[in-house]
């Protein structure tokens, strides 16, 4: 069937902010879909609330709306744009749920708008647990024994009959949100209550546990004439019971027989056909090889996280093909863009092994519960490609950008036996390291398989790595053993440790032996057809498939996996840099390892190397390609950290020099620069010991802000009020040394603001000044931000511009730089300078209409800003007010305190834009899913120093018609100022705060911490309960002021005579 001519305008629903379970993969799929539809000649309209994505760039769709993905705003845009159709299946769970909501509200019928791709009934059938179970029974597809519950008591009743353990799976959620495995009634009650709250239809499936079986995924495609194919099959390293987003995954499947693969393939195709899904679909199955049977776990009737992985693993562009299927094209009409010759109906073939390992946020949240289950906890993932499981796994581990770059974690050597076994049985994010340690200690693979239900095949691979390790230790500088090690993924650095030498010596010996990697192409067809893809991975074989052109090339280093502090914003900057390089006539070569992102779409660059971001792996690419140089400033701290070692090896680093980057990041050097220019900054000192830190704090005066040097996202940063707190911080939060000092700064209370700077080494352009709503002490990534600045005096703004220009020129900045200020007593103090792209680049590029990363790249490559049409100084601001709001994933992580502070905790962001501050704030809160009730009870429980401000806020809530509830101390303060307030009991008393939140007798919580340990523990419990039950929670008083501005702008004044 040719493409449909009866539709012209198509609206694409985006996926909203990045949260755990819904990350950058939807930026990738949404971008692909929009470009695909434009290519076919359709007019496209996009709605997405996330300003950090490539998808919301104005050139991706014909019209882009960065607006809240709520019924109110989407309906308004639909009535204005009147599209012929909506495509919801590329916007994750958010897109599907929005489509269902629009249909139920009658908007689609009212406006005569058609839903493209998978039909609503199919979505409902796949997502509604009861209907899905009924369909599987009709198809004779086996599902675990299960029951539907809409109350906690119904869940308990099913479990009483079936026995424990049971798995709880909420309907219409993603990332396993609200789910879990319950071992007993108490756990079941807790998980079900949470699951019912988080399910938009208040429904959960209670399922007999099949934990321990093999978990297999099939990524399938179907078109409107019932052609259906399998794009990719994948096997989870971890058995059923751990969310696939938290599991190590291999493609293609490694341990299944041909018969088993065929059995599961037939089931997957039968299901997609029965659901009549048009586009991409992910089928998850559990296989019990011992009984020769399987179960269907669930189906995602949309493009998913696994689709992005399958696309990158195979080279098959699932989202692009799905968009074309949605407008009527069939698989036998769509050309495969990888080969340029085969059609999309050909199933990809893989002649390599792909390994995906999740990236978890536990380096940020050290107190979080690291145990893995059916609710996803990872923020991102890495992918590595090799010729065998060992090579792919080892490359994936060193792609994670964690402190461990080898499967043999030296710190586990001192672990006692009981803790080792516990770490093996109770799966955590680091279980693979525990398994390897157990193998080193002589545990048999059969014993480990019995303890974990992980297939012996994979444990054998770990044993093989250990055997090679032993050979390396026994025979240093042996060419045959070295070749064996390299073919199995060992890095030069790790081999150096085993040979008691260093990475450079190993590299020199390897090159002397003529041992260098070759690059193989990912081409969807295992080399069967001629391919056009410039998409490569390294391995140690003979034939190199990456042909070096005679064009001048530039290597751009990506930012690796999505994590807190280094999110999709850096991928945005990377993609813009690639575009500028290509526009200037250079060949753009990307090195990155994140399967979720736009930068690793092979069509974005001239060449893509899917490799770990380490010195060795990057140098191997450079040795082959011989580029003009490398750009590091768009890849976050991951890429910046590679600048110095690459420069030491004679590689040209484009942009700000390594020496000037170090001047900005080294505290003593930076202090000298600040003083030489007469710039204000909070007093600060460095310390390399605990006693040195205490001495520094006492000379500056408490409170102080302490942090390690060279960090991103405020890792291990705290505000410390007393000596005991500082001693505890030094002991538990940082590893301090002469090479890694701790920074101790005066903590100034004031308003924070920040600027991004573009410089060509001479001219300096400041796109705008962003003002933070929360006062200093809250990490910039977690603060609400407004542009243009609303409350800064002209004097302060002028000072910020002057200081920013002076700093950029003094640091000889070429490219981008970010500067953060605190305004104290109407004076601007510099608190931080980051000589690289920051996480504010996407949002500022959009609100100022200055493509900052593109402009910066052109400056880096020698084109002056003036020649690019820019006027030096502060770029004039428009009339529209833009508010960025952070978005958090606290409901996914147990034991993580939601109190905001100097350590970054948000996973994503949204933007609200309008002509007034109150309207922009309202949109930002709505986009962040912080919907405010217009009446009810507000709980106020604050520390002593906040009580003065709390009185004013309480009065404003009271005047709006809200009732006030407070704990004893706060209640007395409010009552003394003439406010009617109800006193509520503390945690140990009856009718306490937590009970009331649990019973929905509190509609909003304002809670700031007290430093005393009992109150601190109470505060954590109050906050976590509010989050669990979906009650709006505020832990910073400035955010309360912002929400009051919104509520007051919507309220009418009622006057009595």
UniProtKB/Swiss-Prot annotation:
Residues that, per the record, bind Mg(2+) 1: 284, 298
Requisite cofactors: Mg(2+); Mn(2+)
Family, per entry: Belongs to the CarB family.
Residues that, per the record, bind Mg(2+) 4: 832, 834
Biological process, per Gene Ontology: 'de novo' UMP biosynthetic process; glutamine metabolic process; L-arginine biosynthetic process
Protein's name in the database: Carbamoyl phosphate synthase large chain
Residues bound to Mn(2+) 1: 284, 298
Key word Ribonucleoprotein present: no
Stretch list, region Oligomerization domain: 402-546
GO molecular function: ATP binding; carbamoyl-phosphate synthase (ammonia) activity; carbamoyl-phosphate synthase (glutamine-hydrolyzing) activity; metal ion binding
Reactions accelerated catalytically: hydrogencarbonate + L-glutamine + 2 ATP + H2O = carbamoyl phosphate + L-glutamate + 2 ADP + phosphate + 2 H(+)
Binding, Mn(2+) 4: 832, 834
EC numbers for this chain: 6.3.4.16, 6.3.5.5
Binding site for Mn(2+) 3: 820, 832
Binding-site list for Mg(2+) 3: 820, 832
HAMAP family: CPSase_L_chain_B
Residues annotated for ATP 2 binding in this entry: 707, 746, 748, 752, 777-780, 820, 832
Keyword annotations from UniProtKB, A to Z: Amino-acid biosynthesis, Arginine biosynthesis, ATP-binding, Ligase, Magnesium, Manganese, Metal-binding, Nucleotide-binding, Pyrimidine biosynthesis, Repeat
């Amino acid at each position: 069937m040719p493409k449909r001519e009866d539709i012209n305008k198509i609206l694409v629903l985006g996926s909203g902010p990045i949260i755990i379970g819904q990350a950058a993969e939807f930026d990738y799929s949404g971008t692909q879909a929009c470009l695909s539809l434009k290519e076919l000649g359709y007019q496209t309209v996009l709605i997405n609330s996330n300003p950090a994505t490539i998808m919301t760039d104005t050139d991706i769709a014909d019209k882009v709306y960065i607006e809240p993905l709520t019924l109110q705003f989407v309906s308004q845009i639909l009535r204005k744009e009147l599209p012929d159709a909506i495509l919801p299946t590329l916007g994750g769970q958010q897109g599907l749920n929005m489509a269902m909501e629009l249909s139920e509200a009658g908007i689609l019928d009212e406006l005569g708008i058609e839903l493209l791709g998978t039909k609503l009934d199919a979505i409902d059938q796949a997502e509604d647990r009861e209907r899905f179970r009924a369909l599987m029974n009709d198809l004779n597809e086996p599902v675990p024994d299960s029951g539907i519950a809409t109350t906690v008591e119904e869940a308990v009743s099913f479990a009483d009959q079936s026995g424990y353990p049971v798995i709880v799976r909420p309907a219409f959620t993603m990332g396993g949100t609200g789910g879990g495995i319950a071992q007993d009634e108490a756990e079941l009650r807790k998980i079900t209550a949470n699951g019912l709250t988080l399910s938009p239809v208040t429904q959960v499936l209670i399922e007999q546990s099949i934990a321990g079986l093999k978990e297999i995924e099939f990524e399938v495609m179907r078109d409107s004439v019932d052609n259906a194919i399998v794009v990719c099959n994948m096997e989870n390293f971890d058995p059923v019971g751990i969310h696939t987003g938290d599991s190590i995954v291999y493609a293609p499947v490694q341990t299944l027989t041909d018969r088993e693969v065929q059995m599961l393939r037939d089931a997957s195709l039968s299901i997609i056909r029965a659901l009549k899904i048009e586009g991409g679909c992910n089928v998850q199955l559990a296989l019990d090889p011992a009984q020769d049977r399987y179960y269907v776990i669930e189906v995602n009737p949309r493009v998913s996280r696994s689709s992005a992985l399958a696309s990158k693993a195979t080279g098959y562009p699932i989202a692009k093909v799905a968009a074309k299927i949605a407008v009527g094209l069939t698989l036998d009409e769509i050309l495969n863009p990888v080969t340029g010759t085969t059609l999309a109906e050909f199933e990809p073939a893989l002649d390599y092994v792909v390994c995906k390992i999740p990236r978890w946020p536990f380096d940020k949240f050290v107190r979080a519960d690291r145990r893995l289950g059916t609710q996803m906890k990872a923020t991102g993932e890495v992918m590595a490609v090799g010729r065998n499981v060992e090579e792919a796994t080892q490359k994936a581990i060193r792609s994670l950008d964690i402190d461990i770059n080898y499967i043999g974690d030296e710190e586990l050597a001192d672990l006692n036996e009981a803790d080792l076994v516990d770490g093996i049985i109770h799966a955590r994010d680091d279980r693979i390291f525990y398994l390897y340690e157990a193998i080193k200690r002589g545990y048999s693979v059969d014993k480990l398989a019995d303890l974990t239900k992980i297939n012996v095949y994979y444990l054998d691979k770990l044993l093989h790595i250990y055997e090679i390790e032993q050979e390396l230790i026994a025979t240093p500088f042996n060419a045959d053993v070295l070749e064996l090690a390299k073919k199995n993924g060992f890095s030069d650095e790790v081999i150096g440790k085993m040979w008691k030498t260093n990475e450079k010596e190993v590299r020199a010996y390897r090159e002397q032996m003529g041992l260098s990697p070759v690059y193989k192409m990912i081409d969807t067809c295992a080399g069967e057809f001629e391919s056009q893809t410039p998409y490569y991975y390294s391995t140690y074989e003979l034939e190199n498939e990456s042909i070096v052109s005679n064009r001048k090339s530039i290597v751009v280093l990506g930012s690796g996996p999505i994590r807190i502090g280094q999110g999709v914003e850096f991928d945005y900057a990377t993609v813009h840099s690639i575009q500028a390089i290509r526009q200037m006539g250079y060949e753009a070569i990307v090195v990155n390892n994140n399967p979720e992102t736009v930068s690793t779409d092979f069509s974005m660059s001239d060449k893509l190397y899917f490799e770990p971001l380490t010195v060795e792996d990057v140098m191997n690419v450079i040795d082959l390609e011989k580029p003009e140089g490398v750009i590091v400033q768009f890849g976050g701290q991951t890429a910046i950290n590679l600048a110095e070692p690459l420069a030491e090896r004679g590689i040209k680093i484009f942009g700000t020099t390594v020496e000037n980057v170090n001047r900005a990041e080294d505290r003593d050097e930076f202090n000298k620069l600040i003083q030489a220019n007469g710039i204000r900054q909070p007093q600060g000192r460095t310390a390399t010991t605990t006693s040195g830190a205490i001495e520094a704090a006492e000379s500056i005066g408490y409170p102080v802000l302490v942090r390690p040097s060279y960090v991103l996202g405020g890792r291990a940063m705290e505000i410390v009020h007393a000596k005991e707190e500082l001693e505890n911080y030094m002991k538990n939060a940082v590893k301090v040394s002469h090479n890694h000092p701790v920074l101790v700064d005066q903590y100034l209370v004031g308003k924070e603001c920040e600027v991004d700077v573009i410089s060509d080494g001479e001219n300096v352009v400041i796109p705008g000044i962003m003002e933070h709503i929360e006062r200093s002490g809250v990490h910039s990534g977690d603060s609400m931000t407004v542009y243009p600045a609303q409350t800064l005096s002209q004097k302060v703004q002028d000072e910020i511009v002057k200081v920013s220009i002076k700093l950029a020129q003094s640091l000889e900045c070429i490219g981008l730089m970010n500067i953060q200020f605190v305004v104290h007593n109407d004076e601007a103090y510099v608190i931080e300078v980051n000589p690289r792209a920051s996480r504010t680049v996407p949002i500022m590029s959009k609100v100022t209409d200055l493509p900052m990363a593109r402009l910066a790249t052109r400056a880096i490559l020698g084109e002056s800003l003036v020649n690019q049409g820019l006027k030096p100084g502060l770029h004039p601001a428009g009339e529209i007010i833009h508010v960025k709001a952070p978005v958090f994933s606290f409901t996914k992580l147990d034991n993580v305190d939601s109190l905001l502070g100097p350590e970054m905790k948000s996973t994503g962001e949204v933007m609200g834009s309008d002509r007034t501050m109150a309207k922009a704030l309202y949109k930002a809160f709505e986009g962040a899913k912080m919907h405010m009730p217009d009446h009810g009870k507000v709980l106020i429980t604050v520390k002593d120093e906040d009580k003065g401000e709390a009185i004013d806020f309480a009065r404003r809530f009271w005047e709006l018609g809200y009732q006030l509830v407070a704990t004893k101390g706060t209640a007395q303060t409010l009552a003394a100022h003439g406010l009617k307030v109800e006193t509520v009991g503390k945690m140990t008393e009856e009718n306490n705060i937590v009970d009331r939140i649990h019973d929905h007798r509190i509609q909003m919580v304002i809670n700031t911490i007290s430093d005393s340990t009992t109150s601190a523990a109470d505060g954590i419990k109050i906050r976590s309960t509010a989050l669990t039950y979906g009650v709006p929670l505020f832990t910073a008083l400035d955010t309360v002021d912002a929400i009051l501005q919104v509520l007051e702008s919507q309220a009418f004044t009622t006057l009595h005579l």
